[in-house]
UniProtKB/Swiss-Prot annotation:
GTP binds at residues 87-94, 195-198. This is GTP-binding protein REM 1. Residues 35-55 have a biased composition (Polar residues). One of its GO terms (cellular component) is T-tubule. The lineage of its organism: Eukaryota, Metazoa, Chordata, Craniata, Vertebrata. Residues 1-73 are annotated as: Disordered. Belongs to the small GTPase superfamily. RGK family.
Amino acid sequence: MTLNTEQEAKTPLHRRASTPLPLSPRGHQPGRLSTVPSTQSQHPRLGQSASLNPPTQKPSPAPDDWSSESSDSEGSWEALYRVVLLGDPGVGKTSLASLFAGKQERDLHEQLGEDVYERTLTVDGEDTTLVVVDTWEAEKLDKSWSQESCLQGGSAYVIVYSIADRGSFESASELRIQLRRTHQADHVPIILVGNKADLARCREVSVEEGRACAVVFDCKFIETSATLQHNVAELFEGVVRQLRLRRRDSAAKEPPAPRRPASLAQRARRFLARLTARSARRRALKARSKSCHNLAVL
């Protein structure tokens, strides 16, 4: 029996259908399968489509973030400020807010909420919109985080006490300390208001005490009477002027240059200057006590 080895060597081998084809390390060829992925992807991966993941956009500022310190000074909210009324119950905060709202002039004010009022005032020929918030008592009774946000979300603060209630005056001093802790680096105007000046016979807090408190805590001072509508307009016009002055003052300030270490001679001069500065401090304190009731100056 003769084996045709030469004929078998020339003819290609026939494989069964179940026999796998050899893997090719090269690219795709007709009739063969390739397990090597293509270097150029024809379609983006799932979850990476540009239509499914649009570029992120910054959220629009909330109304609570409206402030005179906004970087967009040319925006439509430049002259809108949030004024927060603080103080014990019964000192006249709601009466002052109602007079600000001008209930006799419905076309000049808009009530945004139960205790929130908005009104545009023309002071020194320039329009400024104030949003007066009288929600301190509701937030205090609620004992929630909103009371803390009330101390942080104002463009200006009006601390009200009654001249016929020394306890409310002491509470006003405590509120001023809380505001100082909350706004340590902020240039926020704070006005101390002695309301119910019409109750002169029941007075427990003198004008001198109110001024001294304003000087110590670096704020403005004014006495009002919501019953007689005395100094109420001057109060809110003063708030507008203080906001403008603080805004201009903070804009004019430049970051300080880095200080060099002082020499021995410079330190000696500073020490001698401190020894002789007591009279100057007294004069400055006296000047501040004279100007603390002037809401048209810093």
